[in-house]
Amino acid sequence: MSNSEPTRALSDRSPGERGANQPRETAKREIEREATTTVNRGDAERTVVHFMRHGEVHNPEGILYGRLPGYRLSDRGEQQAKLVAEFLAGRDVVHVVASPLQRAQQTAEPIGATFQVDVATDERLIESENRFEGLKVSVGDGALSSPKHWPKLWNPLRPSWGEPYLQIAHRMLGAAQRARAAAAGHEAVCVSHQLPIWTLRRFLEGKPMWHDPRRRQCSLASLTSLVFRGEELVRIAYVEPAGATDPKVTGA
C-alpha cells in the first residue's frame, strides 16, 4: 500500500485553519484534484471510497448516545446531508452504504436519491461501543468527574472504556474493501461515525490509533476519501462540504 503524502493538500491543517472559511466550490475543486492527482480520470482501475460522517443529531440532553436507538438528525443535520449530496452531484457514485443507525441512514438518503441508487447497510460502519453510552461526558459536569467511572479510564491506549481501536480499524477496513469492490472503477459513499472514520484514517496513515479526541479531523458531514488504483490505496483526501464543527461537542 502506497501511503506517501496521503493527505498533504488538505489534511495537514489544524482544525482551526480549515472548514468554516473553506468555500464549498473551493472544497469541491480540492477534493477533485486530490482524487485525480495520482490516477487519471476514466482509469478503470481507479476507485474512490468516500467515508462520510453523519449530519448533526437532535440531542437536547447532550448525552453520548453511541449506539442507542432513536437519535435522528436535527433540521441542521438534514440540511448538511443535502449539501453533501449537492456537493457530490456530477461525480461517478454508483454505490451508497450506511451504518444501520438512524442518523447514518438519514444522512445517506439524499445521496442515494441524487444518484438513483438504493442505500445498502453494512454493520461494520456502526458507531464504536462505549461504556459511557447514555451519559453526559462534558468536562466539569459529566460522568468523567465521578470517581465511580474512573476505573473505566485505566487504559487510554486500548481504550478501556470501549471497543478496541484495532478492532474498529479492522472492521472499517473490511467495509472499505467491500465498498471498493462494489464500486470498482467508480466511486462509493460510506456513511459512518466520527471515531470509526478517524480510527480508520490513522490506521491507514500508520499513526498510533490512540489520540486526543479534541484533535480529530472529522467534522459533521465531512468526507474522508480513499483513492485506490486497483487494490492499492494511493491517496487520502479530506473536505468539509457543510463546514467545520467542533470535535468536542458531546454525541455529535
Briefly describe each language-model feature range.
Residues R24, T36-T38, D43-A44, L83-W150:
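Phosphate-coordination/substrate-recognition cap region in phosphate-metabolizing enzymes
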Residues R46-H54:
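Short, hydrophobic/glycine-enriched beta-strand segments
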Residues V49, H186-Q194:
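Generic beta-sheet signal
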Residues E56-Q106, I111, W161-L173:
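Loop-to-helix element that buttresses phosphate recognition and phosphoryl-transfer chemistry
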Residues G90-D92, A179-H186:
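Glycine-rich phosphate-binding loop signature in dinucleotide/nucleotide-binding domains
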Residues S146-Q167:
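Short glycine/proline- and acidic residue-enriched helix-loop micro-motifs
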Residues K207-V234:
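Domain-level recognition of soluble alpha/beta enzyme cores
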Residues V239-A252:
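Acidic, His/Gly-rich catalytic cores of divalent-metal-dependent hydrolytic chemistry
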